[in-house]
């Protein structure tokens, strides 16, 4: 994805790192190279490795864990002089860089982390003309926002459930921080008096499990049949959209609208989609601010993992008084 690559490039540039992109379709991975081989081969001179693997339920997070196990083994056996940091750029379970950027945005918007407790968040499904959007954003949001004492509602039509183990994490987080986590099948109920709304499409968890099995079996006809079924299922819920009327239900009619971008915008990018053009356009400035935090989140993850005393290092850089030079 073009914008995602630019964000990663920006994060690396911020730290003076040079980025190399591995396209598995053009590598030995496509010819049977194992995870253990790949992990060691790409790590000889690498300080940080970022992996994005979000398309197949049950595989993305597992791949990253297997990759890290191989790095540990390579470092322990003396193959690697250093063990690179792994940054999860997105997997089937979570999208940490996106969700932490979302969190940083709302911390700034509401004037501090201490002001988040008790804020109502509506993480809702929304209609899209496509069917296979990852579950990692809604799962990441309910897993992270409940850690800050917020009242999080996950809303979706019946059949669009997320991974049950992530729901359990959200429940435990809410109980530990004095917030709440609840589910419903009514978008209006979720939007009512919400301080923050995050309407976004995602694919049903069970259907994505089935799709993974079909791809593993090489069942093209089965994949095509599943796609038609899911598109038809989506079309039954076109009323799940962030409209002007829906926004009026939120707190004072002025809830903060979030989206990880790109959004399916009704009347602009598609005939019917996740959000009305007028709503999206009204929130364009805060949306771009939300997106702007992502390269800093990625850079911070790399910096914190690579620098032994990050606080001292940052203080020394601040004392130097050097500014970024523009040429």
What are these regions (language model features)?
Residues 121-156:
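Conserved anion/nucleotide-ligand pocket segment
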Residues 8-107:
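Phosphate/diphosphate ligand-binding glycine-rich loop within oxidoreductases
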Residues 1-7:
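Short, small-residue-biased leader/transition segments that mark boundaries at the very start
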Residues 98-124:
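Short internal alpha-helix immediately C-terminal to a glycine-rich phosphate-binding loop
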Residues 250-327:
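Adenosine-phosphate binding glycine-rich loop
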Residues 172-276:
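Rossmann-like adenosine-cofactor binding region
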Residues 115-117, 146, 245-254, 282:
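Short, conserved loop/helix-junction motifs that constitute active-site signature segments
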């Amino acid at each position: 994805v073009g914008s995602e690559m630019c964000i990663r490039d920006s994060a690396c540039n911020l730290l003076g790192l040079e980025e190399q992109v591995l396209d598995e379709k053009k590598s030995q991975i496509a010819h049977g190279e194992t995870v253990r081989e790949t992990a060691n081969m790409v790590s000889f001179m690498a300080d940080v490795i970022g992996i994005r693997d979000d398309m197949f339920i049950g595989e993305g997070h597992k791949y990253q864990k297997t990759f890290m196990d191989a790095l540990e083994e390579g470092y322990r056996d003396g193959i690697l002089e250093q063990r690179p940091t792994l940054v999860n750029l997105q997997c089937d379970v979570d999208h940490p860089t996106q969700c932490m950027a979302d969190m940083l945005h709302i911390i700034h918007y509401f004037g501090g982390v201490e002001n988040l407790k008790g804020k109502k968040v509506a993480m809702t499904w929304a209609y899209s003309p496509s069917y296979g959007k990852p579950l990692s954003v809604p799962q990441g949001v309910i897993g992270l926002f409940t850690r800050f004492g917020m009242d999080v509602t996950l809303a979706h039509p019946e059949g669009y459930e997320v991974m049950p183990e992530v729901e359990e994490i959200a429940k435990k987080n809410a109980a530990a921080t004095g917030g709440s986590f609840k589910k419903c099948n009514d978008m209006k109920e979720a939007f009512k008096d919400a301080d923050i709304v995050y309407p976004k499409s995602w694919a049903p968890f069970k259907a994505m499990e089935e799709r993974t099995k079909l791809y593993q079996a090489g069942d093209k006809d089965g994949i095509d049949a599943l796609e038609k079924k899911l598109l038809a299922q989506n079309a039954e819920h076109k009323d799940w959209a962030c409209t002007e009327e829906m926004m009026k239900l939120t707190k004072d009619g002025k809830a903060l609208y979030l989206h990880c971008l790109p959004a399916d915008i009704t009347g602009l990018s598609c005939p019917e989609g996740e959000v009305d053009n007028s709503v999206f356009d009204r929130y364009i400035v805060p949306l771009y601010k939300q997106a702007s935090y992502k390269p800093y989140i990625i850079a911070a993850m790399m910096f914190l993992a690579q620098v032994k005393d990050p606080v001292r290092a940052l203080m020394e850089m601040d004392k130097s008084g050097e500014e970024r030079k523009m040429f």
